[in-house]
Amino acid sequence: KKLAIKKGVNIYKNLCEEILSYNGEITGVRLDNGNHILTDKIIFNGDFNDLDNYLINQRIRNKRVANYSRKNRSLSAITWMMKNKTAGFELCRHNIFFNSPYRKEFSDIFKKGRIPSDPTVYICAQDRLNNGSLVSGKEERLFLLINAPANGDFARISKTEMKTCQASVFSLLKKCGLEIDNPQKVPVSMTPQKFYQRFPGSGGALYGRPTHGWLSPFTRPSSRSKISGLYLSGGTVHPGPGLPMATI
């Protein structure tokens, strides 16, 4: 933030209620306080469903960016962030702990619409160097993620379900030989419901449409939309999240 302000950036803390246009071209945005900000270029960093459903005005609605239905959503997630001591073995910066059988996880999510009973766990150990050693200190920052159904707009996860889910996560890690000190005090940082609240229209989906099959990642909208001056970024547009597609 300090660097942005130093470079002359104006930061507005209001919500954007509408993207404005004239003759099919971007002219600005309308904020929730009624103010208009004039511009001929906008970078939208969010779920592209929000554009068609909420932000694009009627004048350019015929130039749809893209859309997807409730039945055609990608994965959501449950995540934890913590700063704890670990033991058992040295983590890498990126770590994946697979469940067994792996296919059951996606059956739980896409066919049954529920949190996997035995989820695969991803851990980003942010303070680890490439050789696995800690940058400094004994505690380290950890980001844990498991896949979940994108049903945040119509389903709620109970406290009992969350306790069961968290227990299965740390049970898998322990089974794999990783001990995390005092995991009971770890708060849940994000759920499908919270992702949905942050990105209305997504239902909590993180990647837009589902990417089933090797060609499906290429069906995402590109960064340049059909609307002159409107550009897209984020996990729902090409190349999507992570390194594999960005590398290609």
Language model regions located:
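A glycine-rich dinucleotide-binding beta-alpha-beta segment and adjacent secondary-structure elements
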Residues: T120-Y122, E179-H238
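C-terminal segments that line or cap access tunnels to active or ligand-binding sites in enzymes
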Residues: K85-F195
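A conserved beta-strand/loop element that lines the FAD pocket in flavoprotein oxidoreductases
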Residues: A4-E17
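Mid-domain catalytic core of redox enzymes
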Residues: L15-V135
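Short glycine/threonine-rich loop-to-helix capping motif typified by GTGT followed
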Residues: N23-I26, N57, A155-K159, M190-A205
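Hydrophobic, well-ordered secondary-structure elements that form the walls
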Residues: I43, M82, L144, L173, ...
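Glycine- and acidic
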Residues: A77, P149-S158, Y231-V237
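Conserved redox-cofactor binding core of oxidoreductases
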Residues: K1
